A protein has these predicted regions:
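Phosphate/pyrophosphate-binding catalytic cores of soluble transferases and nucleic-acid-acting enzymes
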Residues: 1-308
Length: 308
């Protein structure tokens, strides 16, 4: 069976990924799957610089506006949904174009083994009952038999970690050590293309984007989320562009302080994103003046036979 060919477009925030993804999709007959952990949330448009309908230029986009801001959404939830979409897009003769800067989401598609075990309350409850009846020593001995490498890293009295390690095994049939191995997804033929503008240029784009967020009404957007019951403790409100507003709404800092904090945190995040994508040794990197070359390479990848 042929592997599903997927194009991954990554890079730092404000680097121009969304525009390139649309151009690439039109060039190769693709559809776009967003790989952004915050664009999944409805009503969080300005702070996430969510792509607009006009900017999509008629290209179908998935994994945007799929969750309520009060809802928790894990990398496991993402990979489960995204993999179904990838299969559907491919089954219609289209090429999935994965775009975004959330490294863990990208990783969950390329190396799925690491994310195989979601939490299971029933399994956890049974293991906890086992702990209460037989003690931590029993759990530790059991883990030593199953996964001696992981057992070495856990103190025999660290019940929380012992329970999680055994839970992973019972859910997935694989040890935590096996799940940690980065084994490429055998179902996909993956091309990774990274846009990485020079740092000064990127930082200027970040500053301009944050200024636009404020002129577009980000303060009102955050106020609306809070009014509708979203809480500062929600996962969605931990996002850069939102969490910085908490001291403002608590009358602790002025709006200018919020703006500067968002710029600073976004620059730091962009730096971490670039570091993350460097882990992919087979990725191709491009400067902001090399977009046409990037698109040419994506087209070449899309047209070649699998794993040539």
């Amino acid at each position: 069976m042929d592997k599903i060919k997927i194009v991954i477009i990554g890079g730092p925030t404000a680097g121009g990924k969304s525009e390139i993804a649309v151009r690439a999709a039109k060039l190769i007959g693709g559809e776009v799957i967003s790989c952004d952990s915050m664009q999944i949330y409805k009503g969080m448009d300005i702070g996430t610089a969510k792509i607009t309908t006009e900017e999509m230029q008629g290209v179908p986009h998935y994994m945007i506006d799929i969750a309520d801001p009060k809802q928790e959404f894990s990398v496991y939830n993402f990979s489960e949904m995204a993999e179904k979409i990838i299969k559907d897009v491919s089954s219609r003769g289209k090429i999935p174009v994965i775009v975004g800067g959330t490294g863990l989401y990208v990783e969950s598609l390329i190396y799925p083994l690491s994310f195989i075990a979601e939490k299971d309350d029933d399994v956890r409850a049974r293991l906890y009952d086992e702990y209460e009846r037989l003690g931590a020593d029993h759990l530790y001995e059991r883990l030593k038999q199953l996964d001696p490498d992981d057992a070495e890293k856990i103190h025999p009295n660290n019940v929380k970690r012992l329970l999680r390690a055994l839970e992973i095994y019972e859910i997935s049939g694989k040890t935590k050590t096996e799940c940690a191995e980065r084994v490429p997804n055998p179902a996909y033929d993956v091309g990774i293309f990274i846009i990485n503008p020079p740092r000064e240029e990127l930082y200027a784009k970040i500053d301009a984007r944050v200024e636009k967020m404020f002129s577009d009404g980000i303060t009102d957007e955050v106020a609306g989320l809070l009014k509708n019951g979203t809480d500062w403790s929600n996962q969605s409100m931990q996002a850069i562009g939102y969490k910085e507003f908490r001291p403002y709404f608590e009358n602790a800092v002025p709006l200018d302080g919020v703006k500067e904090a968002i710029k600073r945190n976004t620059r730091r995040y962009a730096k971490r994103q670039v570091t993350w994508f460097k882990r992919y040794s087979n990725a191709k990197w491009y400067g902001s003046s090399e977009k046409n070359k990037m698109l040419d390479d994506i087209k070449t990848f899309a047209e070649r036979k699998n794993d040539e």
